[in-house]
Amino acid sequence: MHASRILICDDEPALRELMRIALVGDYEFEEAETVAEAIEVADRFRPDIVLVDLMMPGGSGLDVIRHLAADPALQHAGCVVVSAFAAESDLEEAREAGAAAFVSKPFDPDELSATVASLLVRDR
């Protein structure tokens, strides 16, 4: 069994690092700080989980989620929105686009880890 692949999409390097630290386990990480970079990395890396902020340079995290949902090779990826600025309408739009979960910033490391673990178990 291979290490689960996690793509962390956030324009704040410190937050990306905190997410990596929170996710203790057999994980392989890639990071992206713009929407375009997130899409490029997802296409190459084929992540199992994508942690994505809604507010990113070059568009919205929703663009990343929609890209994953539209690509048969990436549809399996569990998308977790990790965002501080999310109205209920944003969350509904994220769910409709394909997001599986939401974790608010500032995030609780245990909540983030449990959310990722539950999505990985669901998909196995």
Where are these regions (language model features)?
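Two-component/phosphorelay signaling modules centered on CheY-like receiver
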Residues: 13-30
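Acidic, metal-coordinating helix/loop segments flanking the phosphotransfer/catalytic sites
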Residues: 31-49
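Acidic catalytic/metal-coordinating carboxylates
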Residues: 34-37, 60-66
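The feature encodes the CheY-like receiver
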Residues: 57, 75, 87, 106
